[in-house]
Amino acid sequence: MSDNILEIFATSYMWLLEHMFLINVVFSFLIIFFQRKNPTTVWAWLLLLYFIPILGFLLYMILGQNFRKERMFKMKEIEGEIKYAVRRQEESIYRKKLRLRDPELERFKSLILYNLNEGEAVLTDNNDIRIYTDGREKFNALLNEMDHARNYIHIQYYIIRSDELWKEIEEVLLRKARQGVEIRILFDSMGCRGRKGMHKADWDRLRKAGIQVAEFFPAVLGKLQLRVNYRNHRKIAVIDGRIGFVGGFNVGREYLGKDRKFGYWRDTHICIEGSAVTSLAVRFVLDWNYAAGENLFLEDRLFALPEYVRGGKDPVQIISSGPDSSSQEIRDNYLRLIHMAQRSIYIQTPYFVPDEGLMTALK
């Protein structure tokens, strides 16, 4: 019996070696012609396939695939007033009827129109913006706004640590849930894993309290992640459709500057009060619908702007991009802004891996 197994294995191995060249050619054609990638990326994958046959293609299937064509979140789900607002604003721009309060924004009309066409991003100019660069200040503001929630709280983070900061947030969420406030938490499967991350017992405790929880891209087998480069890094909080938070701070003690390894954590988060919050509400619902298998677009109350919104005069256009986008709206916005620069360009980022297009624009 064992001799037969060894013979089958040897035969299969020899067949694989004999056909290795043909298999690599087929895989190479798949990489070149079935995925749109820049030449540098294509060459990198082809070299990997050449030096590590077959295994290289398996790595490509896990790390290199472009899932954009799958349209995971399908923007066509956005109906009603949002679609109408996009079309109406496009007409205003085409007919030069759009009046911007800030004359400086006149030269950005082409960019505004691009964002409308590509990302259905409506421009609103009745917003009040607050900027936070300190984690403690940001989370104090978030906790305060959640404590004043009347109808719903939606929060979405890539990383949530089960530590003292989360305990502060959880305490408010549990209290608001008892008061009848509808609460949804969306977390990324990979970002919340690990020894310091959230565990099943943590989520179960929230669910028992009536809080809805959804996991983005859950692991297939235990900790196996097949889409490691398609994580949800968004950090969004929307309260009553009235106020929204978006930016770079995740939930963890290190973001408060309490981790010796990282020291003081400098990041940027903004708080929006005004009509632009609707765009954040839509973005959350798109991600939630995909992760939870629901259709919250049927619930108009999640997108209605409350009468008690204070608002302001700041113009805002929320640009959203990711594996669900057919084009790279955020990247293209940076490129266009760089090309439009007249005096100076300042870039501040912890992750600077410019592609060919960005390097050409900077030159």
What is each stretch, according to the model?
Residues 1-336, 340:
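N-terminal localization/anchoring segments of enzymes in phospholipid and broader phosphate metabolism
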Residues 350-363:
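Helical hairpin unit composed of two closely spaced alpha helices linked by a short loop
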